Amino acid sequence: NNPENWITYPKTAIPIWVNLISMEKLPEHKILENPSIEKASNNEINLSSHQFGLNFDYDQFPNDFIYSYSSEYSESPLLQMSVIRPDGIKLEIISTSLPYSNLKIIHEDRIFSTDAMIKKKLSLQSDLFDFEIKKLSSENIIFSKTTSNEPLKGNYIFSVNLYEIENSSEIIESNLIIGGKAFGIMGTDELRRDLAIGLLWGTPLALFIGLVVSIASVIMGLVYGVYAGFKGKKTDETLMRFNDVIYA
């Protein structure tokens, strides 16, 4: 029951099979865990890059996005995140320096779509859109057409680059979560718990209880009937009438 275990799941998501019968295709929750990794360096600058590909083919915007990563570095490298959209436009999402350290450390962090730095960075690129984006969420800007605030379908490439001068640094591992409205075969609850897992955990206990109750019912009925037949006369009649009342 540790909420930390469910943070990568969406809140109150519907089952993914609903998209098979729905006229409007809702965005599925995506957890991208296998990025393309590139490393490069020249005489001064070292680069560690992770890229995530996403095929977005839905009729609504995603709920949010979360980028989780761990990096190894010293001093204060620069982390930049951008996305190349299906229309060829490249949007800069965030550019920030990681916390300074004299020694080589492993730093873990998450970047949420609600981060004020992301919203500010996207607002500086408002001239790419034909409508006002000031009041829109980050995900609604990134996944929007430039002519109207409607989902732009196609392939997206999210790139995360870690730059450091002279010293070597790298992104050890990372994943990108695109928050959707459909997840798994049973969906999730308001605490992000996968309902299918709860069903699997509860099934053995439910089967055990059902089996015990059914066997106990048969044994009780057998004993009841044998005793009524053995005693006969008024005892049998009384027990049968009592049985009729219970069944009624």
Regions from the language model: what does each represent?
Residues 208-209, 220-248:
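Cytoplasmic-entry segments and transmembrane alpha-helices of multi-pass inner-membrane transporters
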Residues 215-219:
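Hydrophobic alpha-helical transmembrane bundles that constitute the permease/transmembrane domains
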